[in-house]
From Swiss-Prot:
One of its GO terms (biological process) is translation. The lineage of its organism: Bacteria, Bacillati, Bacillota, Bacilli, Lactobacillales. Keywords: Ribonucleoprotein, Ribosomal protein. Belongs to the bacterial ribosomal protein bL17 family. Part of the 50S ribosomal subunit. Contacts protein L32. It comes from Latilactobacillus sakei subsp. sakei (strain 23K). PROSITE patterns: RIBOSOMAL_L17. This is Large ribosomal subunit protein bL17. The gene is rplQ.
C-alpha cells in the first residue's frame, strides 16, 4: 500500500493524520495542503465506514484512531451535554451517509499559500 511521507517520521505523520481527521469530523471542513487532504481523505472515509457499521468492534477501532476531543457542548433542560468527536461520528455523521457507498469527502482547490506557494485546498464532508 502506498502513502505520502509528507516530510515527517512515521510517528509524526500518524499523529498529524489523526489530528486532521479528528478536526475534519468535528468541524466538517478544514483548509490544508493538497497532499495532506488526499491522505486524510483515506482515513476519514474509513472512519465514516466504521461509523456506518455501528457495532462495538467498529466503535473501538474508531476510538483507537480518533482523538478524544470535545465536538459540541449544549444545554438541554439545565443539563450540560458534552459530545465527543467519536460520538459525533457515530450519532450525527454516519447516519447522514447511510445510503451512500463511499465518496464522503470533497476537495476544493483554492489559491496557493502566500509564503511558499503550496497548493491549498478545502476538504469537507459532502
Amino acid at each position: 500500500m502506498s502513502y505520502r511521507k509528507l516530510g515527517r517520521t512515521s510517528s509524526q505523520r500518524k499523529a498529524m493524520l489523526r489530528d486532521l481527521t479528528t478536526d475534519l469530523i468535528i468541524n466538517e471542513r478544514i483548509v490544508t495542503t493538497e497532499a495532506r487532504a488526499k491522505e486524510i481523505r483515506k482515513t476519514t472515509e474509513k472512519m465514516i465506514t466504521l461509523g456506518k457499521r455501528g457495532d462495538l468492534h467498529a466503535r473501538r477501532q474508531a476510538a483507537a484512531f480518533v482523538r478524544n476531543e470535545v465536538a459540541d457542548i449544549r444545554e438541554e433542560d439545565e443539563a450540560v451535554i458534552v459530545q465527543s468527536a467519536l460520538q459525533k461520528l457515530f450519532s450525527d455523521i454516519a447516519p447522514r451517509y447511510a445510503e451512500r457507498n463511499g465518496g464522503y469527502t470533497r476537495i476544493l482547490k483554492t489559491a496557493p499559500r502566500r509564503g511558499d506557494g503550496a497548493l491549498m485546498v478545502i476538504i469537507e464532508l459532502v
